[in-house]
UniProtKB/Swiss-Prot annotation:
Name assigned to this protein: Lipoprotein-releasing system ATP-binding protein LolD
Organism of origin: Pseudomonas syringae pv. syringae (strain B728a)
Gene name of this polypeptide: lolD
GO cellular component: plasma membrane
Binding site for ATP: 43-50
Domain of life: Bacteria
Length: 227
């Protein structure tokens, strides 16, 4: 992987109409992430951190500005092409995991591989290995309702990593984890940033997690500033 930015945005903004008024949530944001870089975004509740992740991940449309993911401008892509790019180049860990309730932990992690047409035996082998790596080798056949909050979060993290994307975005990734498990996830991110040059963009309230990143940015008054 080259040092070309895996993610960038220019003059990114988002506003909402509330009656006759326009409420500005984000304005004029500039950001670049490079291979292997780990960046944390902190800020108070309601500052727009999750909105920013959704814009950067192509899950929402900006009111102004542009986002490039893996060299592709998201606004120039159709919905299908954007979805394929996200599946290939981006892993996303939501604050509340968003696992498919009718599928097992193993099947949830397999899903991105199967969407990308990986043969089922290979998908199961790779997914099993990754779930073992995050400490869930004994929970492969359990559905989300049979897992604890921390276990569900680890399944979501494994699902985000399974395609070996160039970038992983995480929204409060350690919020449901005990200290030991959270530290294990941090160690895994550090290892992957070095060995695979995976970039990580993390939204968190946990300053102990943020301080372990390469850069910490604060979102305040709709803008990103160095923390």
């Amino acid at each position: 992987m080259s040092d070309k930015a895996v993610l960038s945005c220019r003059n990114l903004g988002k506003s909402y109409e509330e009656g006759p008024e326009s409420v500005v949530v984000l304005s004029g944001l500039q950001l670049e992430l490079h291979p292997g870089e780990r960046v944390a975004i902190v800020g108070s509740s309601g500052s727009g951190k999750s909105t920013l992740l959704n814009l950067l991940g192509g899950l929402d449309t900006p009111s102004e500005g542009s986002v490039w993911l893996a060299g592709e401008e998201l606004s120039a892509l159709g919905e299908k092409a954007r979805g394929l790019l996200r599946n290939r180049a981006l892993g996303f860990v939501y604050q509340f995991h968003h696992l498919l309730p009718e599928f097992t932990a193993l099947e949830n992690v397999c899903m991105p591989l199967l969407i990308g047409r990986t043969p089922i035996p290979e998908a199961r082998k790779r997914s099993t290995a990754l779930l073992e790596r995050v400490g869930l080798g004994h929970r492969l056949a359990h559905k989300p309702s049979e897992l604890s909050g921390g276990e569900r979060q680890r399944v979501a993290i494994a699902r985000a990593l399974i395609n070996q994307p160039g970038l992983v975005m995480l929204d409060e990734p350690t919020g449901n984890l005990d200290h030991h498990t959270a530290q294990g996830i941090q160690d895994l991110m550090r290892e992957l940033s070095t060995s695979s040059r995976t970039a990580f963009l993390i939204v968190t309230h946990d300053m102990s997690l943020a301080r372990q990143m390469d850069r910490v940015l604060r979102l305040e008054d709709g803008r990103l500033v160095e923390a």
